[in-house]
């Protein structure tokens, strides 16, 4: 299960802010790389683990610990998949406008559902029309696994511990 929490902090000191900003920028570059390389036809049928394994095999260095870039990869791939599924809804509408033959409808819907739409010229044209190559506009987001994030209370205030760029070190953020 995926859970999104957005926390606000009014009294974060400059060095912690700069650390978080640097980490978000590095992770934003990874997100952009994912969208650039897999945000089109190249990403159809690929899972985040296949890409992760390929990058590990190639020895790609992102200058961030493994967990943050893997979570960013997973999140970006799920965003691309959601974008592709939204395009499929538009294609379904085009399919229903094009034909009324139940057999042909079923064939086209099945190809679309199984991501085999490249085998049919009409579906390929429609997907190219509605599933244009996406781009990333998010460079200020850090995806943190639930088991890597801790909260604690100090002097009556709630604090959040998140991983930093330094291995086995955390950034403690006061929540207001």
How should each PLM-predicted stretch be described?
Residues 1-176:
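Nucleic-acid substrate recognition interfaces
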């Amino acid at each position: 299960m995926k859970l999104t929490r957005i926390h606000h902090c009014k009294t974060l000191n400059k060095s912690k802010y700069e650390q978080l900003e640097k980490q978000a920028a590095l992770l934003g570059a990874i997100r952009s790389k994912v969208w650039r390389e897999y945000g089109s036809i190249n990403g159809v049928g690929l899972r985040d683990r296949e890409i992760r394994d390929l990058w590990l095999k190639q020895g790609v260095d992102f200058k961030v610990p493994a967990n943050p870039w893997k979570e960013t990869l997973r999140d970006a791939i799920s965003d691309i998949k959601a974008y592709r599924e939204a395009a499929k809804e538009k294609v379904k509408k085009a399919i229903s406008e094009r034909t009324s033959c139940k057999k042909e409808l079923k064939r086209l819907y099945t190809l679309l559902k199984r991501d085999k739409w490249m085998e049919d010229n009409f579906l390929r044209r429609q997907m190219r029309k509605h599933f244009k190559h996406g781009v990333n506009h998010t460079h200020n987001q850090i995806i943190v696994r639930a088991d890597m994030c801790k909260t604690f209370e100090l002097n009556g205030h709630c604090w959040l511990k998140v991983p930093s760029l330094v291995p086995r070190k955390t950034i403690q953020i006061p929540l207001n």
